[in-house]
Design a protein with these regions (language model features):
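Extended substrate-binding grooves/exosites of carbohydrate-active enzymes
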Residues: 1-213, 218-224, 229-238
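C2-type phospholipid-binding modules
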Residues: 193, 287, 292-294
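Extracellular and select intracellular beta-sandwich modules with Ser/Thr-enriched
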Residues: 240-242, 291-296
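Residue-level detector of beta-strand face positions
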Residues: 213, 229-231, 275-277, 323-325, ...
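Buried hydrophobic-core signal for structured, non-transmembrane domains
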Residues: 210-218, 259, 274-278, 330
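Beta-strand/loop-rich accessory regions of lumenal/periplasmic or secreted enzymes
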Residues: 260-269, 284, 298-383
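Short acidic/polar inter-strand loop motif in beta-rich domains
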Residues: 278-286
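Intrinsically disordered, low-complexity Pro/Gly/Ser/Thr-rich segments with frequent PxxP/GP/PP motifs
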Residues: 227-272, 279
């Protein structure tokens, strides 16, 4: 019925009119969440919601986390509980809490700005585990940049700050958060989406013996609408390959099968993988026959530990007022007594480092860090 527009009697009236006009439509509105009069309602701010608490909310019942999005009893005129950007813990709480009886939909999640969308599989592991969880809508589909040329003549995508005079308020790159670039070029996040959403999953049973499980994630189609292939690979080469016979398997069901690769010589220290894939068997309105719809890679051998006979040498330790010196033959290491940093490392007089090795717990901030979660402020003590 709307987006980020508050909640009140006007929305109740819109819902009633919609149900009267077309009772087959379900009503969704994220703004209609939580009834403050409910005895279990907890008005917790966004900052407090990040803090795990343990609070008794009813006789013999304990809730691990109470946040705005885990509050009960959304208004009766919405058919589903709609939430934005819940944490995994909050989403699991919604999925399991007995006071929630309606299905749950994420009207926005997996904000795809900059280097992002890497947590998608964690959300879908939860969604597939709980029938109450319907899924969600990634914000958003496409970048809203405008084509222009930079000073060197190269085409680039312009956004807030590229047009306004200095000092004028704008939203910066907060419109560059899609799965596609403005010219419909596929961005890396889209490949993660394809993998997480693929209709067929290949799971390990005993890959070393060729045993795998094929899971049909479809709601209506059998596995026989696809063709299947396999490859046995080392790090660089295809060693064996063939087609894979998958019995017709109903939607939501799975089947265990064997991949018919032949015994092969394994080199110590090498890794070997099964690559499995599914393809459209016939032409579809959205894809030609042979379009790859699913893929997986399963390890069939662990990396063997390489044995090295290390030379046995005597280590001499010398203590100084400000450092410790460790020597063994022509190798030298110096550690600062005050900081604990390794300040020097050399072999045959040749330095291996150009300065002290310091612990670094801070990575470069992503767009979502800077523009959304504000980690540079909330977690700056790790800098």
């Amino acid at each position: 019925m709307g987006n980020e527009s508050g909640c009140g009697p006007a929305f109740a009236a819109v819902s009633a009119w919609t149900k009267d006009a077309d009772p087959t439509r379900f009503i969704h509105y994220e703004g209609a969440q939580g009834v403050p009069e409910h005895p279990l309602y907890r008005p917790i701010s966004r900052s407090q919601a990040a803090v795990a608490t343990s609070e008794v909310v009813a006789a013999g019942e304990t809730a691990a986390r109470f946040a705005e999005m885990a509050n009960p009893d959304d208004p009766a005129y919405v058919d589903i509980l709609s939430r934005m950007y819940p944490t995994l813990e909050e989403l699991e709480f919604l999925a399991e809490w007995p006071h929630v009886s309606r299905p749950v939909l994420l009207c926005e999640y997996a904000h795809s700005m900059g280097n992002s969308t890497g947590g998608l599989n964690d959300y879908w592991t939860l969604i597939r585990r709980h029938k109450r969880l319907l899924g969600g809508h990634i914000w958003d589909w496409i970048d809203q940049g405008i084509e222009r040329r930079d000073a060197s003549g190269r085409i680039c995508w312009a956004y807030g700050g590229d047009f306004e005079p200095a000092g004028e308020v704008h939203d910066g790159n907060f419109c560059i958060n899609g799965l596609l670039a403005p010219d419909r070029t596929v961005k890396p996040a889209m490949y993660e989406c394809k993998y997480v959403f693929q209709p067929i999953a290949f799971e390990p049973v005993d890959p070393a013996q060729g045993r795998i499980r094929v899971v049909n994630r479809n709601f209506f189609s059998s596995t026989d609408v696809y063709d299947y292939k396999w490859e046995l690979r080392d790090e660089n080469h295809v060693l064996q390959s063939g087609t894979l016979a998958v019995p017709p398997t109903a939607p939501g069901e799975s089947v265990e099968i064997s991949v018919p690769y032949k015994p092969f010589r394994q080199i110590p220290g090498a890794e070997y993988w099964l690559r499995l894939s599914a393809y459209e068997a016939q032409e579809r309105p959205y894809a030609e026959a042979g379009w790859k719809v699913a893929a997986e890679q399963l390890k069939i051998s662990a990396l063997s530990a390489l044995r090295r006979d290390l030379p046995q040498g005597r280590v001499v330790v010398r203590e100084y007022a400000d450092s410790l010196l460790f020597t063994s033959g022509s190798a030298k290491i110096v550690i600062s007594r005050s900081s604990g940093y390794l300040t020097s490392c050399s072999l045959d007089g040749c330095p291996a480092i150009c300065g002290p090795l310091k612990p670094d717990f801070w990575r470069a901030a992503t767009d979502n860090d800077r523009r959304g979660w504000k980690t540079d402020v909330l977690l700056d003590f790790w800098k």
